[in-house]
Curated annotation (Swiss-Prot):
Its cofactor is Mn(2+). Involved in the gluconeogenesis. Catalyzes the conversion of oxaloacetate (OAA) to phosphoenolpyruvate (PEP) through direct phosphoryl transfer between the nucleoside triphosphate and OAA. This is Phosphoenolpyruvate carboxykinase (ATP). The lineage of its organism: Bacteria, Pseudomonadati, Pseudomonadota, Gammaproteobacteria, Pseudomonadales. It comes from Pseudomonas aeruginosa (strain LESB58). The keyword RNA-binding does not apply. It catalyses: oxaloacetate + ATP = phosphoenolpyruvate + ADP + CO2.
Length: 513
């Protein structure tokens, strides 16, 4: 708890960080006690500004391309020195946190930020350990200086902002970025590169535990329901977004949640609603005159967010981890209305759909996607965060599923009765009913019906869910239109899957024409 003379605030309390943020005009307090900030022209992640330093340890291990862009080591050193010197000349904030809750797999991180609110954000999302780095591991450094402006011609960046990962030096440089989600996802990408070397599968998923100790994983892209569906009052939350699956354990990479706020309601999302209080950060949420958040207002962005520590969730796993998963759920938001509310997958189908990562970008977290909705394929349900070739993660998933005997399901949180604009979206209570049936074990060994074209098996009955919803063809008034839509979706799957070199058994597990 030191405050140096040159205004370097080190490991000060969350309350003090809120105080400093208010004092510096970085944000304002909402009626619910949370700190409300605006992130400027970037209200989501900026994938075109993210780089990985190319050096001997990464050169042959990373799937280089549009997602993982190489950055020269000498340019990195020059830019780090420039940003560090700039930051040292102004007040800044330092916190010492962990990334990874399991003792064997945590990374100690020295997090330096130019703003108090981004330091508070990091304290919400990363893990505040009782003792910092007890194992004496090599320390990672995150340097996040939002008010530094990069000069592309000089710095080698793509714009005025950048996110650069350097594995050789254990450094993450974030400059010119006010959207704090960049910091969280940068450290996730670091763990996603490192964990497979330890035979641990890193996952873009939520996880919770039942009273009996049974664990459920929810894979899915932003807006498909990971945070909402894992925040279940009848179960204990492990985490809402980033986990590792090793032998005997599923552990949270983080110590907090980053929930989408658009149209948030106490009725539909009571756990999240209650968690947004003093110590939490609201990004790009509009307040009324009484300082009450208006979660329906998307005038700043569809991607408004709440960051809060897991301590704000009443029912949570105290250790921030659990055993291996009984149920693995792939959440997909299907815009075509073709996919059923729930399908039961075998191991080959699990590999196929994990590699495909079919879903929609709903109120996307990425810059430039706007409020529009479009279909996408995102490998491993999180392509932007997985630096290694996709096969590395798929092989680990199948290895883990086989070893533990986890059951795998594909759950559609998107449209039924027609595509987007014609049909309607499954409501949250219906999807919660599907999840409850999965978690109760009611679908294990259930009688199924096979759906041709999309090549999926659906249960004939799901407790608590209307039977006529289970086969999506039945929900369409025009059956021929459904068949055409199914063929169209199958074509998309087949086209996307051409890039993967996998066994014939896995190829045959997807949609067929």
């Amino acid at each position: 708890m030191t405050q140096a003379n040159n205004a370097v605030y080190t490991d000060i309390s969350a309350a003090q960080l809120v105080e400093e943020a208010i004092r510096r005009g970085e944000g304002e307090l909402a009626a619910n006690g949370s700190l409300v900030v605006r992130t400027g022209h970037r209200t989501g992640r900026s994938p075109v500004d993210r780089f990985i330093v190319e050096e001997p340890s990464t050169k042959d291990a990373i799937a280089w391309g549009n997602i993982n862009r190489p950055f020269p080591a000498d340019k990195f050193d020059a830019l780090w020195a420039r940003v560090e010197a700039f930051n040292n000349a102004q007040d800044h904030f330092i916190s010492h946190v962990h990334v990874g809750s399991a003792e064997a797999y945590y990374l100690p991180v020295k997090m330096t930020t130019a703003t108090a609110w981004q330091n508070l954000f990091g304290r919400c999302l990363f893990i505040e350990p009782e003792q910092y780095n007890p194992a004496g591991k090599d320390e990672w450094q995150v340097l996040n200086v939002a008010n530094f402006e990069c000069v592309p011609e000089r710095d080698g960046t793509n714009s005025d902002g950048c996110v650069i990962l350097n594995f050789a030096q254990k450094k993450v440089l974030i400059a010119g970025m006010r959207y704090a989600g960049e910091m969280k996802k940068a450290m996730f990408s670091v763990q996603n590169f490192l964990l497979p070397e330890r035979d641990v599968l890193p996952m873009h998923c939520a996880a919770n535990i039942g009273e009996a100790g049974d664990v459920t994983l929810f894979f899915g892209l932003s807006g498909t329901g990971k945070t909402t569906l894992s925040a279940d009052e009848s179960r204990y939350l492990i985490g809402d977004d980033e986990h590792g699956w090793g032998e005997g354990v599923v552990f949270n990479v983080e110590g907090g949640c980053y929930a989408k706020c658009i149209d948030l309601s106490e009725k539909n999302e009571p756990v999240i609603w209650k968690a947004i209080k003093f110590g939490a950060v609201l990004e790009n949420v509009v307040l009324d005159e009484e300082r009450v958040p208006n979660y329906a207002d998307d005038s700043l962005t569809q991607n408004s967010r709440a960051a809060y520590p897991l301590e704000h969730v009443e029912k949570r796993s105290e250790k921030n981890l659990g055993g291996e998963p009984n149920a693995v759920i792939f959440l997909t938001c299907d815009l075509t209305g073709v996919l059923p509310p729930v399908s039961i997958l075998n191991n080959e189908q699990a590999a196929y759909h994990f590699l495909s990562g079919y879903t929609a970008l709903v109120g996307s977290t990425e810059m430039g996607s706007g409020g529009g909705i479009k279909s996408t394929f995102s490998t491993c349900f999180g392509a932007p965060f997985f630096p290694r070739p996709a096969g590395v993660y798929a092989e680990l998933l199948i290895k883990r599923i086989k070893a533990f005997g986890s059951k795998v399901y594909l759950v559609n949180t998107g449209w039924t009765g027609g595509g987007y604009g014609v049909g309607k979206r499954f409501n949250i209570p219906t999807t919660r009913g599907v999840i409850a049936a999965i978690q109760s074990g009611a679908l294990i060994g259930a009688e199924t019906e096979h759906l041709d074209i999309i090549n999926l098996d659906v249960p004939k009955a799901v407790p608590g869910v209307e039977t006529n919803l289970l086969n999506p063809r039945n929900t369409w008034a025009d059956k021929a239109a459904y068949d055409e839509a199914a063929k169209g979706l199958a074509k998309q799957f087949i086209e996307n899957f051409k890039k993967f070199e996998v066994s014939d058994a896995i190829k045959a597990a997807g949609p067929q024409l």
